[in-house]
Amino acid sequence: MTILNHTLGFPRVGLRRELKKAQESYWAGNSTREELLAVGRELRARHWDQQKQAGIDLLPVGDFAWYDHVLTTSLLLGNVPARHQNKDGSVDIDTLFRIGRGRAPTGEPAAAAEMTKWFNTNYHYMVPEFVKGQQFKLTWTQLLEEVDEALALGHKVKPVLLGPVTYLWLGKVKGEQFDRLSLLNDILPVYQQVLAELAKRGIEWVQIDEPALVLELPQAWLDAYKPAYDALQGQVKLLLTTYFEGVTPNLDTITALPVQGLHVDLVHGKDDVAELHKRLPSDWLLSAGLINGRNVWRADLTEKYAQIKDIVGKRDLWVASSCSLLHSPIDLSVETRLDAEVKSWFAFALQKCHELALLRDALNSGDTAALAEWSAPIQARRHSTRVHNPAVEKRLAAITAQDSQRANVYEVRAEAQRARFKLPAWPTTTIGSFPQTTEIRTLRLDFKKGNLDANNYRTGIAEHIKQAIVEQERLGLDVLVHGEAERNDMVEYFGEHLDGFVFTQNGWVQSYGSRCVKPPIVIGDVSRPAPITVEWAKYAQSLTDKPVKGMLTGPVTILCWSFPREDVSRETIAKQIALALRDEVADLEAAGIGIIQIDEPALREGLPLRRSDWDAYLQWGVEAFRINAAVAKDDTQIHTHMCYCEFNDIMDSIAALDADVITIETSRSDMELLESFEEFDYPNEIGPGVYDIHSPNVPSVEWIEALLKKAAKRIPAERLWVNPDCGLKTRGWPETRAALANMVQAAQNLRRG
C-alpha cells in the first residue's frame, strides 16, 4: 500500500501575475484572444511542471480558470444567462467574460452575474443563475482540452470537477421561483458525458469537489447525494472531495455513496482520523488533507505524521493539501526582503508541495529525520520575542463591557449629527477609494523602490488627494472622501502601519477574475506605533467645507483578509487590532474629522461554515467592531460598509454593531438585500449601493432613480443614503465621473420630488 500525494489545485495567476496582465491586456483590446490563450497554456504547463519537480505524484487538471472555477462549470454545463448569450448560440471565452464582467471585447454589454464569497474564504465566484425549465448540455470543453494538454506533456493527472449537488447549492433562482434542486436530474447527463470522455482518455481518478458536504445542509439536499452519485458511478474512480470543515456530522450520507475515495480537510475540520478509518468502507481510499492550503505557515510535519501514522498500511492512503493551494501564494523562495528568522516560519504553495513529498516519504519509509529538521523553525517560533508583546496582552486582558458601548443610543447621536452636518435628504457619498491611476501607482512604486524621496512622494499624494476633492465638489457630492491615493490595498496599508504584521513582495493570491491581493501576515501581537490615516484625512478636510470621511478598515476584515497566526484564537487577533484602531478613531476625531467609516466587508465571510458555530463568532466579531468605534463622541458619525453579503441571517449582529450609517452592496441583487433590513425594522441609516462598480458599465439616471424608489418602499427615505456599491479603485476616471454624475442627478431629482 504505497502512499501517494496530491494537491487539490494550484494557484493560477503566475508568480508575476502573468494571468492578470494577460486578461487585462485582452479586455483593453491590446492583445488578441490567441495571445491570451497562449499565456494560459504556458502557465498551466509551468505549474504542472513545478508541482511535479516539488515531488507531487498526481497533478490536478481543471483547477485553472479564466475567471473562476464555478463560472467555468456553468459554461461546461451550458448554463449561460440569456442576456450573455452569443446571437448564434455558441459559447466562447468572451461569453465567460460577459458573465463575469458585464462586457467583453465582443458581444453586447449586459449586467454581470452576481458575485459572492467562496464558502468562508476571500476568493469569489460568479453565482450560477437558474430558471424554470432550463436545459443543460456539454458546451465548454476547457476541462477536456486541459486534460489532453497535460497528458501530451506526459503527466500523471487527476481531473478536478465541481460536483453537481454543490454546484446547484451555490446558485440562485432567477424569475419565477422553484426548487433549484429539481434541476439535478437535468445536469447529471452532462456530468455522465464528461466522466465518459475522461474515461476514454484513460483517466483513473477524478477529484469531484462537494464542499457543500461540510455544511449543515437541509435533509432534501443530503438525500440528493445518493441518487446523484448512483448516476455518476462506474466510469472512473471518484474521489469525493470536501474541505474547509470536517465531515463527521454528514458521514452517514457520505459512506452510502458509490465512490471509491474521500478527501477530508484535517486542518480546518475536527474529524478524528481513527474514527474516519473505522467508519469508511474498507476498500475506500482516504485522502488526508494535512497541509493547510489556506495559510502561509510552515507545517509541523512531526505533528502531521503523528496524526496519520496509526492507519498507515491499514487502507489505501494519500496525503494532500487541505484544500486547493489557490488560497496560498506561489513561491517563498523569491521573497528576498523577509527577515531570515521570520521567513523560516513560512511555506507557500511550492513549499507545501515539498512538505507533502517529505510527509509521503516518511510515511512510506518510517524515517522521520527529515520531518524533524523541517519542523524545527516552527517549533522555535513559539518562544520568539517577535511574537509576544506583554503591553498588548495586558491591555487586552483589561477590556470591560464599557469599552464597547457608545455614550448614547443612536436616536440621541443622530440628532447631534444632524445639527452638526446639516445634510440634505438623500445625501450622496462614495465608499472611499477613487481610481488608482497609472500615475498614482507609479508614484507609490517609485517611492517604494527608493527612486523618489519622501518630500516629493508626499507632494505627489497631496496633489492626487486635492484632485479627488475637486472632482467630488464639481460633481456635487455631499460627503467627500480623500480617495486613498496613498493606499495600495485596504488591508495591506493598515498592516504596514501596525506592529505584528509582515509583508511579502510577491505573495499574491487571486480574489476574483484578474483581481489579486497580497495579504499581510500576522506574526505576533498587534499594536499601533503611530497614527496611520490622520495626516491625509486632516489635509483633505482642509481643502473643503464639506465633511470628509476618515477611512479605516475594520478589525474583522483585517483579520479575515490577512494570513492569521495559528497559535492564538482569531478572537484575540481581532480584539488586538480593534484596540489599535480605537486609538486611530480618537486621533481622527481630535483632528476635526466628524465622519469616520470603519469598513467591515468581511464580517459575514468570517462566519464558521456550520450555523451552530455562528453565535460565538458573531459575539466577538461585533464586540471587536464596537471596541474600535465606541470611543467616538455623539456628534461623530460612524459609518460601516459591507459587500457581497447575504444579511438576513445575521441582522441581529449587524444592528448590534450600532453604526450610525451602513452602506451595502445591493445593485447586482436588485435591492433584494434590503428585504432583510425591512423585515428586521433596522433602526439606523442605510446606503444601498445603487450601481455595480465591478462592471465598467455606466448606469443611467433613470436606473438609479428606480432603484432608490424601490429602496424607499422598504426603508424610510429620511434614513437612506445614496452611494455606489463599493470603492472605485479599479475603475477609470471617465466611467467614474459619468456614473457619479448620474447618481448625484438621481438624488437631486428625488429631493425635488
UniProtKB/Swiss-Prot annotation:
Alphabetical keyword list: Amino-acid biosynthesis, Metal-binding, Methionine biosynthesis, Methyltransferase, Repeat, Transferase, Zinc
Q: Using the record, list the residue span of the signal peptide; answer none if the entry has no such feature.
A: none
> Can you tell me which residues bind L-methionine?
431-433, 484, 599
Per the record, the GO terms for biological process are: methionine biosynthetic process; methylation
Annotated 5-methyltetrahydropteroyltri-L-glutamate binding lies at 17-20, 117, 515-516, 561, 605
Pathway recorded for this protein: Amino-acid biosynthesis; L-methionine biosynthesis via de novo pathway; L-methionine from L-homocysteine (MetE route): step 1/1
Q: Which residues bind L-homocysteine?
A: 431-433, 484, 599
The residue ranges crossing the membrane are: none
Query: Under which EC number(s) is this enzyme classified?
Result: 2.1.1.14
* CDD domains hit by this protein: CIMS_C_terminal_like, CIMS_N_terminal_like
Active-site annotation: 694 (proton donor)
Q: What does this protein do?
A: Catalyzes the transfer of a methyl group from 5-methyltetrahydrofolate to homocysteine resulting in methionine formation.
* NCBIfam families named among the record's database cross-references: met_syn_B12ind, PRK05222.1
Q: Which PANTHER family match?
A: 5-METHYLTETRAHYDROPTEROYLTRIGLUTAMATE--HOMOCYSTEINE METHYLTRANSFERASE
Q: What is the protein named? A: 5-methyltetrahydropteroyltriglutamate--homocysteine methyltransferase
Q: Which organism is it from?
A: Escherichia fergusonii (strain ATCC 35469 / DSM 13698 / CCUG 18766 / IAM 14443 / JCM 21226 / LMG 7866 / NBRC 102419 / NCTC 12128 / CDC 0568-73)
UniProt gene name: metE
